[in-house]
Amino acid sequence: MLIDNDVLIDAGTGIGDLDLEDLDSIRHVFLTHAHLDHIAGLPMLADRVFDENFETPLTVYAREETLRAVQAHLFNGVIWPDFSKLPAPENPMLRYHVCSPGDTISIDHRDFYAVDVMHSVPSLGFTVQNSGGVFAVSGDTKTNETLWPVLNACDDLRVLVIEVSFPDEMESLAADSGHYTPKTLTTDLERLHHEPEIWLTGMKPGEEDRIFEQVVEAAPDKNIKMLSIGTVLHV
């Protein structure tokens, strides 16, 4: 998910839909967690923006556990070069920044706030605030007690991008793997005090229409939309 032109939230295969010029502008990546569908594009991004004469490094922000996984299993000199030591260890192109729940990272006119969420591995959601309001991304999560108080505390929540991976018929698998279903999501949405646009993401391929219909049926009073490649959100 590209924020303005310089920040990504997660770096999955979707970055392949960005133009080369778009990739060249990215200098900040916030990772929700270390699962492959959220980091698969990171090596190619680092390779694309690598320049021995760079002015601004590529900084990856994530929980300590996520950064350890990326360093050990991705940029380890075997799967992919360790760009945190290139072109020189004292001045690397790729830098890591630990971002823990409750931390705020300010980049220009935007504040990125990290929220603890409940997935099968340590994970984060993020709120992004600028002068126009607040945009929130849940990351992968199941029902939890941490995301909703943070969202309710936002002054002007305009957009919520939230995952819902499985239809209600697969509730057991969703719970075991740390994901929402339409039923569990809409139950949690009742706790939300704001009325933002709600964009659904992370749906399993082939299940999108059924999941969307189940969410809309369970929450007919909410402004539910389906996120797709190329969608542009304004805050």
Task: Give, region by region, the residue ranges found by the protein language model.
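Conserved beta-strand hairpin/beta-sheet module of binuclear metal-dependent hydrolase folds
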Residues: M1-D22, S123-K142
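Active-site neighborhood of phospho(di)ester-bond hydrolases with catalytic His/Asp-centered motifs
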Residues: I9-G12, R27-D37, Y61-R63, A136-T141, ...
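Active-site catalytic pocket residues across diverse enzymes, especially alpha/beta-hydrolases
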Residues: A46-V49, L74, L151-C154
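Metallo-beta-lactamase
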Residues: E64-S123, D221-H234
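Cap/insert and terminal regions of metallo-dependent hydrolase folds
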Residues: N144-T231
